[in-house]
């Protein structure tokens, strides 16, 4: 079975109905029927909450967070192995703190990372599905 990890950018793409939203929706439909697995990193939940809160207000942020929890996503939470992998990535690659956790999660699971973030392109061994980048 195929396994995908949805980056924060993928979930915000879906929420904003941006280019690539249909692909994210397709993966979630497949996950809901057991055809594939969709995963998410715990840090993505925080990113969705704070980004939407900052741009649209607290109620919208909390609503977006609650919506994420209802999606057919298996959420990966912090563990010692994941922490070490994220720290190694952060120490050796020019990624943000959150992106290091997200990349580590995809690598830990052997999942394809679905994203809109060119910074992920530099990581060796990371399976990627790139959504259309913003122009």
Residue positions per predicted region:
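Short, well-structured N-terminal submotif of metal-dependent ribonuclease cores
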Residues: 1-40, 53-66, 134-135
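Acidic, PIN/NYN-like endoribonuclease modules and their adjacent C-terminal/linker elements
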Residues: 1-3, 103-135
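A generic structural signal for short hydrophobic patches within well-formed alpha-helices
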Residues: 11-12, 45, 120-121
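Anion (oxyanion) recognition and catalysis
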Residues: 32, 69, 107
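Helix-loop "lid/cap" segments that line or gate small-molecule binding pockets
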Residues: 51-54, 72
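Active-site neighborhoods of divalent-metal-dependent phosphate/nucleic-acid chemistry enzymes
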Residues: 73-116
């Amino acid at each position: 079975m195929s396994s995908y990890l949805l980056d924060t950018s993928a979930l915000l793409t879906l929420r904003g109905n941006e280019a690539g939203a249909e692909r994210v929706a397709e993966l979630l439909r497949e996950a809901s029927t057991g055809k594939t697995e969709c995963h998410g990193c715990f840090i993505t939940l925080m990113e969705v909450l704070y980004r939407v809160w900052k741009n649209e207000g607290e109620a919208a942020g909390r609503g977006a967070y609650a919506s994420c929890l209802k999606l057919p996503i298996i959420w990966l939470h912090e563990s010692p192995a994941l922490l070490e992998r994220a720290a190694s990535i952060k120490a050796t690659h020019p990624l943000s703190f959150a992106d290091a956790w997200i990349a580590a999660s995809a690598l830990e699971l052997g999942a394809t990372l679905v994203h809109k973030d060119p910074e992920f392109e530099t990581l060796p061994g990371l399976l990627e599905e790139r959504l259309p980048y913003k122009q």
